[in-house]
Design a protein with these regions (language model features):
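Short beta-strand edge segments in extracellular beta-sheet folds
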Residues: 134-140, 249
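Low-complexity, Pro/Ser/Thr- and charge-rich linker/hinge segments at domain boundaries
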Residues: 25-28, 139-163
Length: 249
């Protein structure tokens, strides 16, 4: 076969096959499983522009900070998925930032053991850009009983939002904490009870960003987002029992 014919063959190879040929930088035995389950087997590339920042060791496995930054991909970001590969409940969040919200999320989550952490960013061309990190942990963060439920009066504080808005040069940083036990169903006798939906809205009720949360998120969840410009915003939340909460930010 001539060289020109060989080049033609490689040119006609499907895009997803070329992208999927990349080796996993963390060599995780669970990568292919989550590629199929979370990303539906769609084209991907491991991309250092997607920053996934976690501590090297989780001092408290029930409260592990994660910072996902996809600003290097600019306005091409459609959605961000984050998960901990060896957790009994791997998925942490699914974030659709919208045009007025920066593709950046900071949140706290639980880990059951040392695990690879992934954030996959879908861009407008249909390719997932995957950032990776790893956190070591003594373990037990997912199966530990809730601390919130031991505190008197936690039911009266359910859904209370504490936080603020911090002005920046090109926009605003929203930092908040929501009172909620975030029960994941792994503790005997306590069913799932967790915040599963959140939206950032403008004052007219238009949705600027959506965030789907999973039971891996820590109790009394903390969240940081960035909004472009200096418009007033509101946060709307709902848990899996249908309780709705709202707060001005």
């Amino acid at each position: 076969m001539r060289v020109r014919d060989l080049l033609l063959v490689f040119t006609l190879l499907p895009l997803d096959g070329v992208l999927a040929a990349q080796p996993d930088p963390l060599q995780s035995v669970m990568w292919e499983y989550h590629h199929e389950r979370v990303l539906n087997g769609e084209p991907y590339v491991f991309d250092d522009r997607v920053k996934v920042l976690v501590p090297p060791f989780a001092e408290d496995a029930r409260q592990v900070p994660m910072h996902v930054d996809a600003r290097a991909l600019g306005d091409e970001v459609v959605r961000i998925e984050a998960w901990a590969e060896l957790n009994p409940i791997p998925r942490v969040f699914s974030f659709v930032p919208g045009e007025q919200v920066v593709p950046l999320v900071a949140i706290r989550f639980r880990v059951e053991q040392a695990t690879p952490i992934r954030a996959a960013v879908l861009t407008r061309d249909g390719v997932w850009h995957v950032g990776s990190s790893r956190v070591d942990a003594a373990g037990g963060g997912c199966s530990a009983p809730s601390v919130v439920r031991t505190q008197p009066g936690w039911e009266q504080r359910l859904g209370r939002v504490v936080g603020g808005r911090f002005e920046r040069a090109a926009g605003s940083r929203l930092r908040l904490q929501v009172s909620h036990p975030m029960d994941n169903g792994l503790v005997g006798g306590i069913p799932e009870f967790f915040l599963n939906q959140a939206e950032v809205r403008d004052t007219e009720g238009n949705t600027l960003a959506t965030l789907e949360l999973y039971p891996a998120v820590s109790e009394n969840p903390t969240l940081s987002l960035e909004v472009k410009g200096h418009q007033d915003t509101r946060l709307w939340l709902r848990d899996n029992n249908g309780n709705e909460f709202e707060a001005a930010l």
